[in-house]
């Protein structure tokens, strides 16, 4: 395959990898008509402005949480084991309600008409500081008795976990049956998380999984379009007996879990109602309303939902809820990126270093493809050896394209050359390249994972551009092993394109560039060996099969 084809295939891979979501956006979820028509008075409560917070601080080994004492909202969540993007001296902050962005978790109880029964009343807690000393730490927020109902909101944080259990304890002293539901929400604005860029841009926004609708992204842009179209409400509504919903961003997520893996669904009293929308205050809400069984006079009841707010670590989230690992955004190539990451993870478990695991994975992929690529590289070597004869044909027939093509086809037949044979290696590598790109880009396991020396974060670009420069050198070396173009313009492009691609790779994750460098080095060794073998055979006058 000549360099023109190589360039074309490489460009196609980059376009698919980077621009797939823009070229083929995820179809907009269409809620069931009867569900979309439903209205609840909870809307007004849900869209109330975030009031100033009276903070309660909870510190565990994994997180530092700030809860608003009055509303009971989880207003700030710092992940203590992860460093901030671009600032290793600070921990990563997931939730926040400051000037820079709004991203909070809310929960409340609704009456039969959908009204927040504690609106304007507020909770209180016995103290303002909580620290994990055992396996769990509990924060109990108590509200004044309202219409005969005594309500506590209880947060339970667990050691070495990013799961937070949010429970309502209800005592009905009203003398009549209480019909309530609990509403759990993730609310955020449209601000871009730190570290987003053109080559490092990932989906940010609501996600939902239900058995009926499977996994879906409900993008901010779709909700914005609904709002701009003049609809009275811009939202996605669905009823479901189980599932999960929330918000995701690069490497991190926050989701309400309706059914823990191997456990019972919180929707046992009736289908839960999922509602994802853009609110009138231009914040975005992903909420679920959980119906409670009727609470008889004098009886007590509780309802609890787990909130997972933390990293998208595959081995962790896969054990929290069914299909929660789908929230790890591999784009359109999840079917290929997921098994690639599984293999990479197995190698890491053995080797103990993600960088060397990538090197070994590259060798394995190269070995698997060897039987096919070897025949293709031999075809390229034959084409290279036949280049002088091709030039002679071009000079002999000049502008007579028909005669020139006939002579070239006869030469290919005589020399046993498949002119398309060289395309196969690149075609085979494109899905691997794209799949590995997303596997490396989306996996929080590689976030701030070192390889050696100057590479301290395989998920981010090489800070000194050493790997991209090495990659450019390997691409230049490959051009001399490929059949030389007879067209002067192609010859110039052959020298320029390695530089162009290496500049593009300045912005790619170092782990991906490492894969491509190792792959190029292996390819160079393979092509050099084949070229030398064929040249030796031709010098001896042998016919190469």
Swiss-Prot record:
Keywords: Cell inner membrane, Cell membrane, Chaperone, Membrane, Protein transport, Transmembrane, Transmembrane helix, Transport. The chain crosses the membrane at residues 350-370, 424-444, 461-481, 498-518. One of its GO terms (biological process) is protein insertion into membrane. It comes from the Bacteria. This is Membrane protein insertase YidC. The gene is yidC. Pfam families: 60KD_IMP, YidC_periplas. The keyword Chaperone applies. PANTHER family: CYTOCHROME C OXIDASE ASSEMBLY PROTEIN COX18, MITOCHONDRIAL, OXA1. Belongs to the OXA1/ALB3/YidC family. Type 1 subfamily. Required for the insertion and/or proper folding and/or complex formation of integral membrane proteins into the membrane. Involved in integration of membrane proteins that insert both dependently and independently of the Sec translocase complex, as well as at least some lipoproteins. Aids folding of multispanning membrane proteins. The keyword Cell inner membrane applies. GO terms for molecular function: membrane insertase activity. GO terms for cellular component: plasma membrane. It is found in: Cell inner membrane. NCBIfam families: PRK01318.1-3, yidC_nterm, yidC_oxa1_cterm.
């Amino acid at each position: 395959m000549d360099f023109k084809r190589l360039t074309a295939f490489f460009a196609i891979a980059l376009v698919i990898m980077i621009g797939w979501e823009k070229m083929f956006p995820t179809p907009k979820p269409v809620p069931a008509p009867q569900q979309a028509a439903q209205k609840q008075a909870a809307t007004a409560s849900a869209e109330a402005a975030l009031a100033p917070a009276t903070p309660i601080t909870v510190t565990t080994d994994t997180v530092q949480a700030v809860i608003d004492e009055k509303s009971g909202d989880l207003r700030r969540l710092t992940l203590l084991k992860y460093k901030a993007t671009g600032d290793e001296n600070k921990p990563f902050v997931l939730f926040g309600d400051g000037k820079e962005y709004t991203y909070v978790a809310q929960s409340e109880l609704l009456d039969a008409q959908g009204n927040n029964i504690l609106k304007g009343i507020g909770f209180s807690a016995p103290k303002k500081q909580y620290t994990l000393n055992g396996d769990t730490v509990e924060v109990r927020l108590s509200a004044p008795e309202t219409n005969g109902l005594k309500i506590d909101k209880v947060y339970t944080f667990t050691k070495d976990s990013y799961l937070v259990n949010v429970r309502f304890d209800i005592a009905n002293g009203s003398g009549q049956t209480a019909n309530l539901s609990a509403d759990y929400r993730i609310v955020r604005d449209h601000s871009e998380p730190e570290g987003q860029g053109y080559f490092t841009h990932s989906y940010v926004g609501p996600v939902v999984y239900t058995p009926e609708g499977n996994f879906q992204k409900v993008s901010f842009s779709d909700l914005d379009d609904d709002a701009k179209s003049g609809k009275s409400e811009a939202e996605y509504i669905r009823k479901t007996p189980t599932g999960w919903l929330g918000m995701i961003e690069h490497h991190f997520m926050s989701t309400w879990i309706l059914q823990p893996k191997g456990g019972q669904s919180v929707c046992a009293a009736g289908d839960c109602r999922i509602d994802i929308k853009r609110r009138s205050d231009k914040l975005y809400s992903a909420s679920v309303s959980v119906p409670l069984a009727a609470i008889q006079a004098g009886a007590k009841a509780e309802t609890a939902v787990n909130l997972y707010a933390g990293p998208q670590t595959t081995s962790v989230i896969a054990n929290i809820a069914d299909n929660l690992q789908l929230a790890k955004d591999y784009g359109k190539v999840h079917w290929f990126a997921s098994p690639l990451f599984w293999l990479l993870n197995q190698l890491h478990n053995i080797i103990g270093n993600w960088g060397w695991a990538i090197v070994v994975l590259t060798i394995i992929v190269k070995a698997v493809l060897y039987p096919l690529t070897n025949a293709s590289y031999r075809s390229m070597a034959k084409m290279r050896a036949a280049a002088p004869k091709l030039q002679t044909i071009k000079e002999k027939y000049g502008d007579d394209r028909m005669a020139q093509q006939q002579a070239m086809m006869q030469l290919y037949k005589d020399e046993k050359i498949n002119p398309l044979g060289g395309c196969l290696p690149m075609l085979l590598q494109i899905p691997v390249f794209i799949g590995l790109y997303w596997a490396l880009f989306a996996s929080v396991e590689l976030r701030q994972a070192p390889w050696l020396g100057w590479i301290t974060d395989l998920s981010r670009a090489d800070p000194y551009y050493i790997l991209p420069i090495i990659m450019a050198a390997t691409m230049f070396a490959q051009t001399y092993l490929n059949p030389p173009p007879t067209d002067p313009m192609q010859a110039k492009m052959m020298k320029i394109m390695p530089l162009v691609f290496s500049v593009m790779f300045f912005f790619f994750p170092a782990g991906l560039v490492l894969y491509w460098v190792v792959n190029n080095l292996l390819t160079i060794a393979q092509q050099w060996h084949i070229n030398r073998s064929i040249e030796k055979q031709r010098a001896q006058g042998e016919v190469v099969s």
